[in-house]
Amino acid sequence: MLTSFRLLALGAALAIGAANSIVVLAADKEQVIKDREALMKRQGSDLGAVRGYIEDKNDLAKATAGATDLIQTMQKIPDVFPPGTEGRDPDGKYAPKPEVWSDWKDFLAQRDTAAAKAEALLVAVKTGDKPNIQTAFADLGKNGCGACHAKFREEIKK
């Protein structure tokens, strides 16, 4: 009898804990989506710093800082896509496709590909050789970021 009571109490405690987790997730969902959009915009800014160097609009130090930060932000991508955070970004232009979560391993593999291409971009940036940087930049854009966005990001038509 006492064992049944303990199991019942344990079950109730687990149910309450699970319910509280769902409430926290619901409360945090909006913030996670905002954080996700901010991370993607930060990556865009990082790429802009590299593009600026290629186009003679800024110096190599800014391009290097951007390429370095891009590598760091790539590692944070899984953190801003936890389950239960489906939905449009705050500006309403994009939303992750359900495949982010249903094909999580492939999503992470795409991120790994993009991260490797970001590392190759940093190597190129450190040379200062603009044609080499342009090649690495284009590869990252098409086969890294672009490939992931093509498979896992939906543009919201207004």
Residue ranges and their predicted role:
Residues 1-11:
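Bacterial N-terminal signal peptides that target proteins for export
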Residues 18-26:
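Sec/Tat signal peptide C-region and signal peptidase I cleavage site
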Residues 1, 26-27:
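Absolute protein N-terminus
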Residues 30-62, 68-158:
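Sequence context surrounding c-type heme c attachment/ligation sites in exported
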Residues 10-18:
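Hydrophobic helical h-region of N-terminal Sec-dependent signal peptides
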